[in-house]
Amino acid sequence: MALCATTQRTIRIAATLRRVARPFATDAVVESDYKRGEIGKVSGIPEEHLSRKVIIYSPARTATQSGSGKLGKWKINFVSTLKWENPLMGWTSTGDPYANVGDSALAFDSEEAAKSFAERHGWDYKVKKPNTPLLKVKSYSDNFKWKGNPQPEN
């Protein structure tokens, strides 16, 4: 079975691209040992934000969802310091540029990845371990089983 000219040309172009692109992909991976806080100094972050305190935690399962899509993720939240009540509207205001960053932006696949990110930026961190509830395996019919005679109250 012969392939049409367009398909043959596409296969040749794909093979050429694989040969050309492979060296660049391996060169892009650079392993480097960073000292604590080194990335923060190079990135242009102001000095007062280099010594921030953060909390690393694994968020609980959403009460309204039964799926496992967001389970196992770790997040970083900044400890907020500068808050005041806006006198006009009564809203809570902040002068902290990182006040709402952790809610959506800083998510990691593992606790170690979150720790290394915080260390590279020079942030002091505290890890909150996830609270896993103990679940009893039982069926609906267990609600109606005979549990013996009632015990007298003392």
Curated annotation (Swiss-Prot):
InterPro entries: NADH_UbQ_FeS_4_mit-like, NDUFS4-like_sf. One of its GO terms (molecular function) is cobalt ion binding. Disruption phenotype: Leaves have a reduced capacity for cold acclimation, appear water-soaked, leak electrolytes, and accumulate reactive oxygen species constitutively. Sugar-sensitive germination, delayed growth, modified respiration pathway, and altered stress responses. It comes from the Eukaryota. It is found in: Mitochondrion inner membrane. Induction: By cold. Coiled coil: none annotated. Residues 1-24 form a transit peptide. Pfam families: NDUS4 (PF04800). GO terms for cellular component: mitochondrial inner membrane; mitochondrion; plastid. Keywords: Electron transport, Membrane, Mitochondrion, Mitochondrion inner membrane, Respiratory chain, Transit peptide, Transport. It is a peripheral membrane protein. Its main location: mitochondrion. GO terms for biological process: cold acclimation; electron transport chain; response to osmotic stress. Complex I is composed of at least 49 different subunits. This is a component of the iron-sulfur (IP) fragment of the enzyme. Accessory subunit of the mitochondrial membrane respiratory chain NADH dehydrogenase (Complex I), that is believed not to be involved in catalysis. Complex I functions in the transfer of electrons from NADH to the respiratory chain. The immediate electron acceptor for the enzyme is believed to be ubiquinone. Belongs to the complex I NDUFS4 subunit family. PANTHER family: NADH DEHYDROGENASE [UBIQUINONE] IRON-SULFUR PROTEIN 4, MITOCHONDRIAL (PTHR12219:SF8), NADH-UBIQUINONE OXIDOREDUCTASE (PTHR12219). This is NADH dehydrogenase [ubiquinone] iron-sulfur protein 4, mitochondrial. The gene is FRO1.
